[in-house]
Amino acid sequence: LALLFLVLSAGSGFTQGVRNHVTCRINRGFCVPIRCPGRTRQIGTCFGPRIKCCRSW
């Protein structure tokens, strides 16, 4: 049970912590001003809510 909690809490913190372009790049993401293209998903923002940080699956 403790291991499950550790895994779930680590995963949720990863996706919520990306708020600038440096953190985006560290998490192997890239910044785009539109929707995340193709087989990528949004993991945060880069320069405010309009610029998305995207990462491939």
Curated annotation (Swiss-Prot):
Modified residues (Pyrrolidone carboxylic acid): 16
Keywords from the UniProt entry: Antibiotic, Antimicrobial, Defensin, Disulfide bond, Pyrrolidone carboxylic acid, Secreted, Signal
UniProt note on tissues of expression: Neutrophilic granules.
Sections of the chain in a coiled coil: none
Cell location: Secreted
Transmembrane segments: none
A molecular function (GO) term: CCR6 chemokine receptor binding
InterPro entries, A to Z: Beta/alpha-defensin_C, Defensin_beta-like
Primary location class: secreted
GO cellular component, one term: extracellular space
Disulphide bond pairs: 24-53, 31-46, 36-54
Record SMART domains: DEFSN
GO terms for biological process, alphabetical: cell chemotaxis; defense response to bacterium
UniProt similarity note: Belongs to the beta-defensin family.
Protein function: Has bactericidal activity. Active against E.coli ML35 and S.aureus 502A.
PANTHER family the UniProt entry points to: BETA-DEFENSIN (PTHR20515), DEFENSIN BETA 4A (PTHR20515:SF2)
Name this protein carries in UniProt: Beta-defensin 3
Species of provenance: Bos taurus (Bovine)
Lineage start: Eukaryota, Metazoa, Chordata, Craniata, Vertebrata
Gene name per UniProt: DEFB3
